[in-house]
A protein has these predicted regions:
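Short, amphipathic alpha-helical "recognition" segments used to contact nucleic acids or chromatin
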Residues: 5-21
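Basic- and hydrophobic-enriched, low-structure N-terminal and domain-boundary segments
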Residues: 51-124, 128-135, 395
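Short alpha-helical "recognition helix" segments of helix-turn-helix
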Residues: 26-27
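Phosphate-binding and hydrolysis-coupling loops of NTP-dependent motor/remodeling domains
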Residues: 62-84, 419-459
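Conserved P-loop NTPase motor cores
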Residues: 102-134, 310-423, 453
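Short, solvent-exposed alpha-helical "recognition" segments
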Residues: 4, 35-60
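P-loop NTPase motor domains
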Residues: 96, 132-372, 427-442
Length: 459
């Protein structure tokens, strides 16, 4: 016979938590699951309850194992009214308490960092969740930039509520090119064109594994010479303000080096050009491409910008993404530290490099200071590096196979009490569509993500 958790029990849990009683002891004393205690603990930690009480009830099956209790609640979710303080970004309804769950990425709230990681198999609701989250961010005046590799965020297939409330702007970079120059110098380039040359060569080397030490050196020198020919010289800082050449100029520079019979490195130059030639075939970075100004993005006051990359060759997708992120980093660092301004949403994380020195790694480590957050999404835990796992304060885990229990172990190590490793493992492999196991503030809880159409009345 199932029994309902009374308001008195909920208040008792909160009182015992404030007195420092361990979650396991509270659960045993009150006859509830440690997961339910952990869910309430998360809200207490985030200051989510007002002085009133939480109006909700949920079932407790006395004879079932904890993991069965968790999963059985998934089938009993009904809309509940909550008195929870409306702070942060609404995610959805907590299946163990009935309260609304919020993600609070804002540094002023004490968040470790604003970054979030989303993982789950195909068809479990990742795209819909991202749409809901960025639309919610837009209502708070926070802009988002989505890098779309598979047209999952195409406006042709977007729900009308997304079009109305997210006010999306679509940029067809793969089809029309984009008016951004990877040779642009930024204030953090303290060595001017030398920094630009190193950045370009490093990016190509990360993406094209065939580029070795010699090819890297030739590529770097080619960029330095190209910038010098455009009157941007390392030894003269006044020239660093000059307009840089457009990216296709690098192709001409490498061709000249490879055709110069007196150049001892002509074969290396030809080899480099053969590896990166696809970049120039598509000519994505061009003066006549679609205009994207980061200043306009930062000042848009609640919009979603979608950069369409579908149709580009796989390696070129990575190159374009890295150069765009470096350009974005240059802009945000030029205006200095500040409050949270925007999020970069990177789907299909297997297309990204998390190596030391990559733009993604830099944003994960330093984005908080400059007011930019990352939302990383992919189908498999293996697509994320240890840097990504350790530098994303919030994780949304949808149904995932987790055959080697890698993600279950990583999650259980981060939690303070609450669900056990076995509960987590069983739960994340059986979650229904649209339901995620969320890890934040060292607490794990299960949330039914609220779709855009079900949020409108709260805006």
């Amino acid at each position: 016979m199932a029994k309902k958790l009374s308001e008195g029990q909920k208040l008792k849990i909160r009182d015992m938590l404030r007195q420092g009683v361990e979650s396991k002891a509270i659960a045993e004393h009150l006859g509830v699951t440690s997961g339910q205690v952990a869910a309430i603990s998360a809200h207490v930690t985030m200051g989510s309850y007002d002085k009133g009480q939480t109006k909700t009830d949920f079932d407790l099956a006395e004879e079932e194992p904890p993991s069965s209790k968790i999963l059985s609640n998934l089938e009993q979710i009904e809309p509940q009214k909550s008195n929870k303080v409306n702070s942060g970004i609404l995610l959805g309804e907590n299946i163990e308490t009935g309260d609304d769950d919020y993600w609070d990425p804002f540094p002023e709230s004490g968040s470790t960092n604003p970054h979030a990681l989303i993982v789950g198999e195909s068809g479990v609701g990742k795209t819909e969740t991202i749409r809901s989250v960025v639309t919610e961010l837009a209502q708070k005046g926070i802009n988002s930039i989505i890098f779309d590799y598979g047209q999952g965020f195409s406006l042709d297939d977007a729900p009308p509520e997304f079009l109305e409330y997210a006010r999306p702007v679509e940029i067809h970079a793969s089809r029309d090119g984009i008016n951004i120059n990877p040779f642009q110098l930024f204030p953090f380039d303290i060595n001017g064109p030398l920094n630009v040359a190193q950045r370009v060569a490093d990016t190509f080397q990360r993406v094209y594994s065939q580029i070795g030490v010699q090819q890297h050196a030739v590529l770097r020198q080619a960029v330095i010479e190209l910038l010098s020919d455009s009157e941007i010289k390392a030894e003269n800082e006044e020239t660093w303000q000059n307009d840089p050449p457009w990216f296709h100029g690098l192709q001409n520079q490498l061709e000249q080096l490879s055709n110069d019979g007196g150049n001892p490195q002509r074969r290396i130059a030809a080899n480099v050009l053969s590896h990166i030639s696809t970049v120039f075939v598509f000519n994505t970075f061009r003066e006549g491409g679609e205009k994207l100004t980061w200043k306009d993005v930062a000042e848009a006051d609640g919009k979603v910008f979608i950069i369409q990359l579908k149709g580009l060759e796989h390696s070129l997708e990575r190159v374009v993404t890295e150069f765009l992120l470096w350009n974005l980093i240059g802009f945000i660092e030029s205006i200095g530290p500040g409050p949270l301004k925007c999020f970069a949403v990177l789907d299909e994380a297997h297309k990204l490099a998390f190596d030391a020195g990559s733009p993604v790694e830099k944003l994960l480590r330093e984005g908080r200071k400059f007011g930019i957050g990352l939302i990383l999404a992919s189908q498999q835990p293996e697509d994320f590096s240890s840097v990504a796992f350790s530098n994303t304060a919030t994780k949304l885990i949808f149904q995932v196979a987790d055959e080697d229990s890698k993600i279950s172990r990583q999650i259980s190590r981060k939690l303070r009490g609450g669900h056990s490793f076995e509960e987590i493992r069983q739960t994340i492999t059986k979650l229904p569509r649209g339901v995620a196991y969320i890890v934040s503030e060292n607490t794990g809880y299960i949330t039914k993500i609220r779709q855009i159409k079900d949020r409108i009345n709260s805006w």
